[in-house]
């Protein structure tokens, strides 16, 4: 079957830059879906996305649908005819197939409808495939334009559709398909004739358009790096910003610009924020990570006088930097702590009080937590009290991303200790999955306190997260607490900490069962964390059954169980623990704590008892030191005496005292393993 390249390009007004790559990928996916549904094969694919166009190239696409044969079996002949006359079953089958009964094959044991369906020309199928793909694009809100009733993310301007060197005749979104595209608005305002699908990229390149998103992205990244090196700096190139800039230009030309050095007195985070978010510039840092008074802009034109573009960008950014400078100076005119007065009029949550109320709670809880993790209570309390002050500053009012960062600078300006100042920023850490954690113990205490306060408060008024709705980011808060404690190796029992947080709210929350509910929610987050690490759910559940209060202790047990499961004895011991657990659950009355050797009547009982005593003596110091892996490895040696016991001993002996003593022995055995985890859940 012959094949040809297929190209479709939809020209539009400027597409939303943050959605461009997604729209391009979805356009390709939709076309592939349509081609596959039509049974059309191809050898390659490529998507192109630029500010004014979405395009897809399909390489070596079948020009003809393959013929198809369908065979549908109907009712048996015996049921299809009675006394030589067709039954309702036969007539119904013919009607279902859309033919007369005489056209149905009656030569076999059943009625059979056979039909040969010739394949259609690909060119006749492509308009519907393209149109369906465009209709399925993830566009939150479509728009209409002029007098047209068509809807799309932006008004359409032109349409190119070529199969081989022939135009696919159709009209989509009010555009008649042709072979004429458009070049760069300024460098090549004339139409561009696309000779063949394979020449699409080069035809546009001659018209100063780089259609390939990935090519533009790579060019911008490479040239930005080169220019930064020439300035003896390193460019800050966040992937999201790089994607957005790539989506804004068809012919990228990076240029170096500068600003006055006096602006460097402003916190560099504020300058970087305004240059990145508002102007889409790439900022430059020196070898020590300090901001240079230069930045890189990406022009969409190759100017004969690039100095004019540089000058224009420098003029545009100056007022924004001046604003940041003004806010910084204004805020520093008063001590940071005084901003707490404003927070007394800012509601955190209607039922839970003001932001100032929250700061006071965080202060007390942080002071409680700090000494438990090796920190200083007084400094943690001070940091907690100042933690929300910068929310009332001019700087954060203009640049919300500066919350915490602004507080750090203002605290230093007021002469606060370094760790107190750092804690004002670290309270928000981690800001996302895999993000940086607090480096100071003061910061860790405030971060944990802030998150626990939010969890307890919101749970306490019944506003639990449901499905995808989590307006107070409670899942992220819980994961943040766990990450800080586990990855910073901080051994904090969360149970009393959460109970302390509950007491602070008083009558504002429903306290009954609240601490348990919050703790359950926090530790439930570990399940997904361990699954992401490749740790089996059963391992998590074996530790969860013991309900450790320390996240660090929980993690150490999980890692130990994971290592234990790799031992050759693990599977058998897990099965034995499950058997023992079932036996003990059926025991009548309380199980004795002491084992009485005088009731043993089998050598294997003595052997197991001796092995348990030796193991107990060995693992006690290990358990005290939380050497859980070593403890389980030592307990693995119990496999042989345990196996021998169950082979030779009837646990449910007729003699009640012997039976009770054997239950006590097995309880001792199970207790050894429960010192680490309930491994009966591993089976």
Swiss-Prot record:
Reactions accelerated catalytically: tRNA(Gly) + glycine + ATP = glycyl-tRNA(Gly) + AMP + diphosphate
One family name in Pfam for this protein: tRNA_synt_2f
Alphabetized UniProt keyword annotations: Aminoacyl-tRNA synthetase, ATP-binding, Cytoplasm, Ligase, Nucleotide-binding, Protein biosynthesis
Source organism, top-level taxon: Bacteria
SUPFAM superfamilies the UniProt entry points to: HD-domain/PDEase-like (SSF109604)
GO biological process: arginyl-tRNA aminoacylation; glycyl-tRNA aminoacylation
Main location, first listed in the record: cytoplasm
GO cellular component, one term: cytosol
Group of enzyme by EC: ligase
NCBIfam families assigned to the protein according to its UniProt record, in alphabetical order: glyS (TIGR00211)
Protein name: Glycine--tRNA ligase beta subunit
Designated gene of the protein: glyS
